[in-house]
């Protein structure tokens, strides 16, 4: 398989447009036409992980955290990032990363945490905004099914767990073809009225070019009338963090022990106990201090995240316990997400989980 076959799939399944502005997800190292035969999946790219890829014969590493975050002006081995890049190039190992775009995915990092905790009624904590477009076009009624199918196949029409979503009304379109035209219906130079369907649907903004291309190819008219504009709707299935309900209420100290066991946390930092049993839990894999107010607003009794600052631990007050299980611990299951995603699409492609613990933090 070519590297570009795998990266094209990942770029589509976990859209790069969903990543934060500071992020650098996607292909980090490697030529797109390179042949790949096996992948090593990890959280971080380190010396030990590169060695492991060499021993295992893997010629691509798929990580959650990008090796390259900021612009690099030289490759002299001066920094750890430069040294790792040189080592990867020397070993002819490609590197691909899925970071904050995987964090916000509908089946992303926080959702995996919820799955491990067996939460029910899982919902997005902080939905992404401004990532939806509305498409309206006008189609001759006898070509409606063809056009609708084409834009659906291109990715339009998805709302939550529903696909093929659209709305259609009937009306009459008018036009007159000028010089050099070859109208599909009517005659050049004469006003024509045609029974048409107004077709409306929604799409993710990153699919706009693909959907419009499909529309233009399937539509019978020379000049296709369509409107496309951004929506202010929240995308309730995509965003940072999530909330969910425990199968039954649990005492706070018991819940701390459960969280520590599930996420293999060697040390847990947590705020003042509230004295309440925990029913609703909010989660955010990685550094989630910025979502404490969202977790409170959701009515959560506990919020599990990582990298919480000292003063932020006060924000839960007597309403919510804030639990910091560690960055590595909160995102360790990202490898499972990537594995499941890839193996479903490429069932014969060799995938391997890294056995290296890349957590840079040690505890006494």
Which sequence ranges carry the predicted segments?
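Hydrophobic structural segments
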Residues: 1-364
């Amino acid at each position: 398989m070519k590297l570009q076959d795998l990266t094209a799939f990942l770029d589509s399944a976990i859209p790069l447009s969903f990543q934060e502005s500071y992020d650098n997800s996607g292909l980090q190292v490697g030529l797109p036409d390179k042949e790949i035969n096996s992948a090593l999946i990890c959280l971080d790219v380190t010396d030990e992980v590169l060695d492991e890829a060499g021993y295992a014969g893997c010629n691509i590493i798929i990580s959650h955290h990008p090796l390259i975050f900021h612009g690099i002006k030289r490759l002299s081995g001066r920094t750890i990032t430069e040294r790792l890049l040189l080592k990867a190039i020397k070993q002819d190992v490609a590197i691909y990363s899925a970071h904050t775009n995987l964090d916000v995915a509908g089946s992303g990092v926080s959702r995996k945490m919820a799955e491990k905790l067996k939460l029910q009624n899982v919902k997005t904590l902080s939905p992404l905004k401004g990532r939806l477009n509305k498409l309206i076009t006008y189609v001759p009624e006898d070509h409606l099914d063809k056009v609708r199918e084409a834009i659906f196949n291109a990715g339009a029409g998805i709302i939550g767990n529903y696909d093929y979503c659209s709305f259609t009304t009937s009306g009459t379109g008018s036009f007159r073809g000028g010089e050099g035209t070859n109208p599909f219906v009517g005659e050049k130079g004469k006003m024509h009225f045609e029974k048409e369907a107004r077709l409306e649907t929604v799409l993710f903004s990153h699919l706009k070019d693909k959907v419009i291309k499909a529309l233009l190819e399937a539509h019978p008219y020379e000049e296709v009338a369509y409107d496309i504009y951004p929506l202010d709707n929240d995308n309730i299935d995509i965003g940072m963090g999530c909330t969910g309900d425990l199968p039954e209420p649990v005492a706070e100290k018991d819940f701390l022990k459960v969280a520590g066991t599930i996420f293999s946390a060697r040390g847990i930092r947590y705020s003042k106990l509230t004295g309440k049993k925990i029913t609703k839990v909010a989660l955010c894999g990685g550094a989630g201090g910025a979502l404490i107010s969202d977790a409170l607003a959701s009515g959560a009794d506990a919020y599990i995240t990582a990298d919480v600052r000292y003063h932020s631990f006060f924000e839960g007050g007597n309403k919510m316990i804030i639990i910091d299980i560690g960055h590595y611990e909160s995102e360790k299951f990202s490898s499972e997400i990537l594995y499941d995603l890839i193996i479903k699409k490429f069932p014969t492609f060799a995938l391997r989980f890294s056995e290296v613990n890349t957590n840079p933090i040690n505890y006494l």
